[in-house]
Amino acid sequence: MKLGIVGLPNVGKSTLFNAITRAGAEAANYPFCTIEPNVGVVSVPDKRLDKLAEIYNPEKYTPAVVEFVDIAGLVAGASKGEGLGNKFLSNIRECDAIVHVVRCFDDPDVIHVNGHADPAGDIATIDVELILSDLEIMEKRIDRTKKMMKGGDKAFAKELAVYEKIYDCLAEGKSARTLSFEEDELEYTKDLQLISMKPVLYCANIAEEDIKKEDIPYVNIVKEIADKEGSGVVVISAKIEEELGELSPEDREMFLEDLGIESAGLDKMINASYTLLGLISFLTAGPKEVRAWTIKKGTKAPQAAGKIHSDFERGFIRAEVVAYDDLIANGTYNAAKEKGLVRSEGKEYVMKDGDVVVFRFNV
């Protein structure tokens, strides 16, 4: 899973990225301090994997991972090359979803490009640039398709209708993700890589002192916008997350306890991203390795097996599955098997989150 972190300059985007990866992107108080897109890979928090590691004491522990791409600060006019322009829009196109960091705090010492915090205005500014960039793509697609139809090939009529539907939506200033498509229309959208069609998780970046507040006016604005478009929202303080990133796991727990917070904002962000993209994890466990594997909800057993190795999918015979809770309750895989809790599933089995699996195959 690859997530692109976007936001206007000085909203706390690089501070957040530093917290995620400790990769050292220079979080200076100056627009465009992020000149190249930084990429960081972080583990997906999963206590189930920790528990399996206690049981199996494996040689290798491999959590699922999320790749974050820190996109340099976008500004009004980016789609026309202002600020750092189109190069960075192209980096977002390669991502599965967008994490849009929105400034939800006032601080005279941290310059805002518009002079003051304005969540709705900031979101609109970014949206306009992404929509304009997508409009340019759709114009080219429509022109190309019309030329093909002039050559007498009427097979492109349906394709053109889908492209024009998207174009009209964008021309009204709406993101492509607000559209709904019939099953046969989706086929024509797959290779477009439209940014405004990607799922969005808004990251409301609040002041440290507001971390325990339930009602924050700036955050309420972000939530209202997200609700209207079916996007997700997480509330974090990037500064607190940065501080947490410098601590040992033990000290992190103590720090969170002192703050009165159950879990780190970054953990919430990763989990919310999974939900937004409809992802789940299945687990494999043994003395050599315990590992989490990321798949889409609705994935069948052979395709899940293919995540491990293409031979597993090609020669799939069956999946031997035990629910994580059943395995833990019985202490070991063999004990669960003796109680009849390990099921033999075939090619049509739809994987569930937390399935602990052994795949049987023959090639």
Residues covered by each model-derived region:
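Short, well-ordered loop/turn sites that connect or cap secondary structure elements
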Residues: I92, M351-K352
